[in-house]
Amino acid sequence: MLLETCWEALERSRIDPTTLRASHTGVYMGAISQDYGPSMGEATEGLEGYLVTGGAASVISGRVAYTLGLEGPAVTVDTACSSSLVSLHLACQALRQQECSLALAGGVTVMADPGIFVEFSRQRGLAADGRCKAFSAAADGTGWAEGAGVLVLERLSDARRNGRRILGLVRGGAVNQDGASNGITAPNGPSQERVIRQALEAAGLEPAEVDAVEAHGTGTTLGDPIEAQALLSTYGRGRSTDSPLRVGTVKSNIGHSGAAAGVAGVIKMVEALRHRTLPRSLHIDEPSPHVDWSDGTVRLLRESEPWPRTERPARAAVSSFGISGTNAHVLLEEADSDDAVWGEPSEEGAAASAVALPEVPWLLSGHGREALRDQARGLYEWLGDAPEIEPADVGLSLAVTRARFEHRAAVVGRDRRELLEGLDALASGELASNVVRGTAAGDRHPVVLLLTGQGSQRAGMGGELYDAFPAFAAAFDEVRAHIDPLLDRPLGEVVFAPEGSLEAESLDRTGYTQPALFAFEVAMCRLLRQWGVVPSYLLGHSIGEVAAAHVAGVLSLPDACALVAARGRLMDALPEGGAMVALQAPEEAVTASLSGRDGVGIAAVNGPRATVVSGDHAPVAEVARHWRDQGVRVSELRVSHAFHSYRMDPMLKEFQRVAEGLTWHAPEIPVVSNVTGEVLTAQEATDPEYWVRQVREAVRFGDGVRWLRENGVGTLMEVGPHAVLASMAMECLAETDTSTGVVALQHGDHPETRTLVTGLAEAHSRGVDLDWASLFPTAERVDLPTYPFQRQHYWLTGQPRTSGATVPEARPDTDTETTEPEPPLDLSGMGPAEREEAVLDLVLRHTARVLGYSGPEEVEENRGFMDTGMDSLAGVRLRTSLSQATGLELSTTAAFDYPTPATLAGHITQRLDGAASTEADPSLSGLDRLESALESGSLGEAARERLRERLNALLTRLDATQPDPKGADLDNATDDELLDLIDKEFGIS
C-alpha cells in the first residue's frame, strides 16, 4: 500500500519516480507495528528469512528507498497517532539541513488483526457506531480507519527552480513530549499548548495570523476537552470576534487512521487552502458541554464555509498527539498563485523549436500487457471528462512525468479525436494504424543510424520537415550555404521543385542526387540529435557513408560538402551507360557465376541473399539471364551509371586529388565501413585512399549489419528519405535475430511529419531513449491518471495457529494446486532453438515459484530479477532450484551475474551444451571444474593472476605446431592428473 502511494504521490507531483534513482531523496514514514503473520519462532520453509524484513515496521521506509533507489535518509517513525506528522516535521528539518534534496513524508496504517479493536474496547475507547464525533456532546470514543498518505516535499527555492506545481508551504512545526504527566496515555493540556507555541515561534507567526486548525479530534470524552482548551488558550485569545479560529477534524469524515492520521489532516488542509473552502466536520449536532467555548474566539466548523479573505496569505495548523505522549504541530500556508500552476514551457524546449509538433504522440507503458491496456482505458475515460485539456499537454505529461516500462505503446494523431480513437483501440486490444506497440529490452542497447544511398531520392523530399521543424531547416540551409557554390544551380530549387517539373527531374542526376541525399540526412541527424537520439554507430550505404563520416566528425561541413559535390559531379561526368542488377542470391554463388565474364562485378552485398552486380550492359544481362533461368528473382535497377564497378575508374584520380586536399579527423562516433563491413578505423577514416576505394569497391552493407548484430545493437533507425535500408536490414536479421529492431523514419510519399513521429514512437516502444520534452516546446504539464497497478493478493492461508502448528505459505488468490517436484531437465533429441526455449521455460517456471507468482506467464524474460523484487535470499533459492533441475553447479550469485531470466537461461544453455561436449570428450571436464571455481568466487586475486599466466601459457602451447615436452605431458595427462594439478596450483577443493 505504501509503495503504491509513494509512486502515485510522485506521479501527481509530475516526477517520474525512476528518475530519482541514486538521488538524495529522503523517506520519512510513520508506521505502527502490526501483528500480521507469524512470529519469528514459528516460521517454516518459505517464510524464514522474510519475517523481520517483511513484517517489521522499521523496514517500511527502507523498503520504499530500496525499491525506488533513493539514497537520502530513510526513517520509520512510530510515535503512535502522531507518527506521520512527526515524520513530516523530521523531513522538513532534513531538507533545511541539506540532508536530502527531496523527501517523501507520510504514514500508513493497516489493521490486519482485531487486537487493537479488542484492546480499545476494553478501555471503552471505541465509539459504538464506529464514528468519530469530535468536540460533540455525543462523543463516545474513536472509530478506526486504515490507509496511507504521502507528501512530496522540496525546498521552496528548489521547487521553483525545478518548475514544480506547489500545492502549499510548510511554515514551521514543533514536536514535544508530555513527560511525567497524569498517565502515559492521557492527553496533557499544558504540553499541547507548549508545542503549539513552539511551532508558532518556529514559523515566525502570531496566533491571530492562523485562520484554522485541523485538530487531532479523536472523539473521546477525555481527549477532546483537553485539546479544545489548549486551542482556546493559544489561538482563541486576543482574536477579534469577526476572525475566530475555525476548528475541524478529518477524523469525523474518515475515522482515526492511526499512524496516517496526521498526514490525512495535512492533505485535507492543503486541499482546503487550494480550494479556499473550510470543510465541515461531521456529527457536531451540539458542541461538547465539557468545554468552555466562551474562553476564546473559536468556532467549530459545523458547516462548510469560504476561507476568509485577508491581506495576508491564508494559513492553517495541524495537530497530532500520540497516545505515548509525543505531540506534533505544523503550520501550513497557501502557495503563491504563481507557484500553484504547472511550470511554464522550458526555455530549452522553446529555444529548440518555435512551433508545436504537428503530430502528437501519446506514450504509454506498463509492466505487462494488461497494465498497458488499463492505462489506455483509464486515460481515455479521464480525458472524456476533461475536454479542455490540450493533446500536446497530455503528450508532454505522459512523456516526462511517467516511468517507461517494458511493455510500451504510442498513439499518434493530429487532433484529439484521432488520439482518443487510438487510445480506445489500444485499450480494447485492437489494431489501429496510429497505434504502435513494442517491448523494450531489459538492458539498453546501442542505437544505429542508417544513412541511405542513391535510389532513395524523391521529388520534394524534406519539404514538409523543412516547414515543420526549424532545426531541420537550419541544418538543411547550412548545407546549402556550403554546397550551392559548388553546383550549377541551387540545391533547394532541385530538391523542393514540384514533382514532374524539369527541376525535379534533375534530382535523379547523380550530380544533384548525392548532394540532396547528403543534405537531407545531415538535417535529419541534426534533428534527431536535438531530440536526444545519440547513435552508438553509424552505417551508411555508398554516399550515405560520406554523410555518416560528417555526422561522426570525420569531416567538417565545408569539407564534406566539397567531397560530396566532387563525388557527384565526377560520377555525373562519366559516360552514361552500363547496368546494375539486384539478384536474390548469395554472394558466393553470384561470384561463381561471374567467372569468365569480363566487364561485370559485384557492386553490393546487401544481405545473405541480396547481391547487386554492376558493369557493362551485355555481361550484366547475361548474368541476369543466368539467374532467371534458375528461378531466382532478378531486378534491374534504374541507374544512369554502373556504380561501384570498373566504369568508375576514370574519375578516381581526380576524386583522390580532392580528398587529399581536405582535413580528416578520427571518428567521434563509430562508423561501420562499406568496404570492410566492420568499424572504420581511425587510420582508414583519415586516409583519402580509403574514400577512393569506397567509390570503387563493393558496398558490404550486409556484412555491416551482421557486425552490428554480433556486437549487440538494439535498434537500427533509417534516416533517409525512403525506407530502403530498413528492408535490407530486416532481411539480414530475419533468420538469426528477433531482438534487433529496424525502424524507418520516412516512407516514400507518406506524410513526412506523421511518418517521422510514428517512427520515433516505434523506436521508443523498442526502448530507444529520446528527449521527449524537446518535442513539446510549447506544451504544459497537466494532471493525468496514475499508474494502474495490477494487484494480486498473497494472503497467509491456513487454520488458526496453535502451539507447534506449522506456518502456511503465502499463496496468491488462485485455485492452483500444489505441484509435485518436476523431473530433471531432459534436452536429448532437441535442436538448438528447442533447447534454448526449453531452458528459458525452465528458468521462468522456477523464478515464478521462488517469487510466489501464480505462474511463469507473470515473469518477463527480459525484466531484471532485481526489478521483480528478488533479493539475495530468493536469488540463492533460485540458484539451488535450477541447480537441482539441471544438474549444474551454478554460482550462488547466478541471478545477479545474469540479471534477467533470458540471460540466465542463455548461461545455463551454454553450460549444458558444454556439459554435453564434456560427455563426448571427458578431457574437458577439468575446464568445467575450473569454470565452477571461477563462478563461485573461491579464487583469491593471487590465484587468479597465476591462473591467467598459466592459461596464457597453455594457449600458446595449444597454438604451437610442435608442442614441447611439457605441453605433450600436459596433453597426455589423465583427467585426475589434470584436476590434481589445478588443485595443487590454485588451491581449488
Predicted segment positions?
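Helix-rich "cap/lid" substructures immediately adjacent to catalytic or cofactor-binding pockets
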Residues: 58-61, 438-539, 543, 613, ...
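Acyltransferase
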Residues: 172-173, 177-183, 421-422, 497-719, ...
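Condensing-enzyme catalytic core of the thiolase-fold
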Residues: 1-352, 374, 381, 505, ...
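Flexible catalytic loop/linker elements that gate and position reactive groups at enzyme active sites
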Residues: 187-202, 315-447, 463, 573-581, ...
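Flexible, low-complexity inter-domain linkers and amphipathic docking helices that mediate domain-domain
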Residues: 390-393, 416, 682, 787-989
